[in-house]
């Protein structure tokens, strides 16, 4: 099963840290995402504290009210290698693909070692787009395994994107997403028109939208502009305490996205202007001059 099938937009459900440290909730999220029509599950893999900008600062855990170091907080949100393996098995058993944003070289190794036969895709998060050594390594791993490397462009200018693309090994299957690193993102900051620009600059890449908004409409618009994959932050309940719930879609929202983008893809056609058989009876009745 390919990550992308022509004519169907690939929807990736990003679990982020919305399980609030609960592996049981993670399992529920994977099952709910599959039921809602997602094609893939994505998680985050970090090596704590190596991949943290400031691990020593204090953090109040939103769902417990307990104060701890930032490193302790991030560790609470991380999956163990066994949990990564179990989530991958569950995801694949439900007919979806499994991958992760890897925040460092050690995280890449952790993911590859933990998951049977390795992940189905890698992703470079927006914050990693200037880490060209990491992106190059992920592209080599992706090329070697025959899987995609996804690039997210939040907080990037075109030069940053070009640097990341050029750092990838030739022949790697690259997927590039328009993204705005704002959580949740206001519609006027989504800039989905950039999808046109990306398609023009990178005609050989699969262009998509890494979405942090909470409306279905811009996602459908992005598909109309040529996006063929969409990443959504996913939660079981947007009212839960935590860092990403407010910028996430619940199962009902993902179900709407699936329905609406499928409808849009059917409506787009192939660009050929034609007379459909269903129009014949109408024209026979209304057209006065043949």
PLM feature spans:
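Catalytic cores and adjacent flexible loops of soluble metabolic enzymes
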Residues: 1-290
């Amino acid at each position: 099963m390919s990550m992308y099938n022509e004519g169907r937009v690939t929807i990736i459900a990003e679990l982020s840290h919305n399980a609030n440290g609960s592996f049981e909730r993670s399992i529920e999220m994977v099952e709910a995402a599959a039921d809602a029509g997602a094609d893939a599950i994505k998680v985050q893999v970090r090596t704590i504290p190596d991949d943290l900008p400031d691990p020593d600062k204090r953090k109040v855990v939103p769902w417990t009210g307990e104060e701890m170091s930032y490193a302790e907080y991030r560790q609470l949100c991380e999956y163990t290698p066994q949990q990564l393996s179990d989530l991958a098995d569950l995801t694949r058993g439900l007919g979806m693909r499994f991958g992760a944003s890897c925040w460092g070289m050690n995280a890449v190794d952790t993911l590859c070692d933990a998951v049977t036969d390795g992940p189905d895709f890698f992703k470079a998060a927006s914050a990693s787009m200037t880490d060209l050594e990491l992106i190059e390594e992920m592209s080599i791993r992706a090329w070697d395994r025959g899987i995609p490397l996804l690039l997210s462009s939040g907080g990037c200018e075109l030069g940053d994107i070009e640097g990341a693309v050029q750092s990838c090994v030739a022949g790697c299957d690259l997927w590039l997403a328009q993204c705005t690193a704002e959580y949740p993102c206001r519609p006027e900051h989504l800039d989905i028109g950039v999808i046109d620009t990306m398609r023009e600059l990178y005609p050989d890449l699969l262009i998509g939208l890494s979405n942090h908004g909470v409306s279905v409409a811009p996602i459908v618009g992005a598909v109309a502009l040529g996006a063929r994959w969409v990443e959504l932050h996913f939660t079981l309940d947007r009212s839960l305490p935590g860092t990403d719930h407010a910028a996430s879609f619940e199962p009902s929202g993902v179900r709407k996205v699936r329905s609406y983008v499928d409808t849009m893809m059917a409506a787009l056609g192939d660009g050929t202007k034609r007379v459909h058989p269903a129009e014949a009876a109408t024209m026979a009745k209304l057209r006065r001059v043949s």
